Structures are given as C-alpha cells and as structure tokens.
C-alpha cells in the first residue's frame, strides 16, 4: 500500500492511539507499537521488521510512562459527577495522547496538537466524543501556565 499520508505526524498519532489502545487490552508496548506501525506495511513470510519512527515511540512510551499524571490531569478537568472510570477507553486513550503531546512536545504548538487529536477522535469515536475531547483539552490549554499558544 503506497500512501503519502503514511509516516505523516497525523498518521503516526493515529498509530500511537492504536498502540496505546492495544496496550490497555494487555499488549506489550513494543509489540503493540510494531503492530500499529506495520500492520498495513509488512507482507509475506520473510518481511523484515520495520524501524519504528521516533515520534511514534515517543508518544507511546511517553503516554505509558506518564499515564498516572495524565489521568490525574484529566480527572481535574472533568465536570462534577464525572470520573475517569465513566469515560470510554477510546476517549481516555485519546485524551491521554492529546494531553501528553500538548504538555511535553514543545515543538508542536498546543492548538496543532489539539486539532490533530480531534481529527483522530472523529475517526475512532463519534462527534459527541470529539466535542468532549476538544472541550477538555481546550480548557487545559487555556489554563496551562506555560501554554504554547502558537
């Protein structure tokens, strides 16, 4: 499958989401990342293992390593009566991924990271969830003391 979209940052964010979702289902981090990156690229029995892009690994490992902190941040921005446990796994994973990129990737402007995760949300969730994710992450961006507003 030849596709100029593959390996774009948007594509890699989507693959990071897929890997993180699989990790939540019990998959090992590296195996989940390799599968998410290569499932549509590797064919045949003698296919070589693909080198994972740094951006993809940074997202997956970063979210995995900061999961508790990210969950606490998400919880503090939920409306009264809501808890992390009430969120779907899809929405939780998208929020963690978006929040991680906003918080830790200085080279990505906050609004770009926000818009990109909304596009992934529209693909893997519904419009209501995309609006919810937009609202929560927008609130975080507007309140963050050193927000990268570019």
UniProtKB/Swiss-Prot annotation:
One of its GO terms (biological process) is transcription antitermination. One of its GO terms (molecular function) is RNA binding. It comes from Streptococcus pyogenes serotype M4 (strain MGAS10750). GO terms for cellular component: cytosol. The lineage of its organism: Bacteria, Bacillati, Bacillota, Bacilli, Lactobacillales. HAMAP family: NusB (MF_00073). This is Transcription antitermination protein NusB. Belongs to the NusB family. Involved in transcription antitermination. Required for transcription of ribosomal RNA (rRNA) genes. Binds specifically to the boxA antiterminator sequence of the ribosomal RNA (rrn) operons. Keywords: RNA-binding, Transcription, Transcription antitermination, Transcription regulation. Coiled coil: none annotated. It holds the Pfam family NusB.
């Amino acid at each position: 499958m030849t596709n100029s979209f593959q390996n774009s940052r948007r594509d890699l964010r989507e693959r990071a989401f897929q890997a993180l979702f699989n990790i939540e289902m019990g998959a090992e981090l590296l195996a989940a990342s390799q599968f998410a990156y290569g499932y549509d690229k590797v064919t045949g029995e003698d296919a070589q293992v693909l080198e994972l892009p740094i951006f993809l690994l940074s997202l997956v490992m970063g979210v995995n390593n900061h999961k508790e902190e990210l969950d606490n941040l998400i919880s503090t921005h939920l409306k009264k009566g809501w808890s992390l446990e009430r969120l779907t796994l899809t929405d939780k994973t998208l929020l963690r991924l978006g929040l991680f990129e906003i918080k830790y990737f200085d080279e990505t402007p906050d609004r770009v990271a926000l818009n990109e995760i909304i596009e992934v949300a529209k693909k893997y969730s519904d419009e209501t969830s995309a609006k919810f994710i937009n609202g929560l992450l927008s609130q975080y961006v507007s309140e963050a003391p050193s927000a990268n507003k570019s």
